[in-house]
Design a protein with these regions (language model features):
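Conserved short "hinge" loops at termini or chain/domain junctions
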Residues: 1-77, 138-156
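Generic beta-strand or strand-like secondary-structure segments
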Residues: 40, 44, 83, 87-91, ...
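Ordered, amphipathic secondary-structure segments that act as subunit-interaction surfaces
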Residues: 51, 73-94
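Short loop/turn elements at secondary-structure junctions
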Residues: 90-156
């Protein structure tokens, strides 16, 4: 089964030894705890930005070199990869107890959630693929312009 995150993605965020301690002493890339934490993180991100952005495209797993004409192209948004790992690791640490979560891990989790809130609300622009309306072929937007002022007619 192809997954969005690769084993090599974790190397920039956490040492392999610590990740093995969190997931058990088995092959940690196939570990059920890790898979569940990744799925939870992806669901959390989808819930925050899914109304504006095409999450099916964002979370598309990498194609293997055999499926991609012999080339390994990483088309994933690296910021999304980073915050997915941050949220995944926070969930893995959380199962050990709230006092055992390192401060930097809690801060990175909170930063990721704050960014997702801002992007989901439209306060922070990003270059993720927007949802396209099949009828108009334009990006779906829920932007509405209104005013609390009553309309004025100044014609005399």
């Amino acid at each position: 089964m192809a997954r969005f995150l690769l084993q090599s993605d974790y190397a920039m965020q956490i040492r392999t030894e610590i990740l093995r301690l969190l997931t058990a002493q088995t092959d940690f890339y196939q570990n059920a705890k890790l898979v569940r934490a990744e799925q939870t993180a992806i669901a959390q991100i989808r819930n925050r930005i899914g109304a504006r952005y095409d999450c099916a495209t964002i979370f598309q797993p990498l194609l293997s070199p055999a499926e991609n004409g012999g080339e390994q192209l990483d088309t994933r948004d690296q910021w999304i990869v980073t915050i997915t790992i941050d949220i995944t690791l926070y969930h893995l640490y959380s199962q050990t107890g709230s006092k055992d979560v390192p401060e930097h891990r809690s801060q990175r989790y909170q930063d990721a959630i704050d960014w997702l809130k801002d992007v989901g609300n439209g306060n922070t622009p990003c270059d993720l693929p927007a949802i396209i309306d099949p009828d108009t072929e334009e990006a779906v937007s829920d932007v509405r312009i209104w005013s609390s002022q009553a309309p004025n007619n100044h014609k005399w």
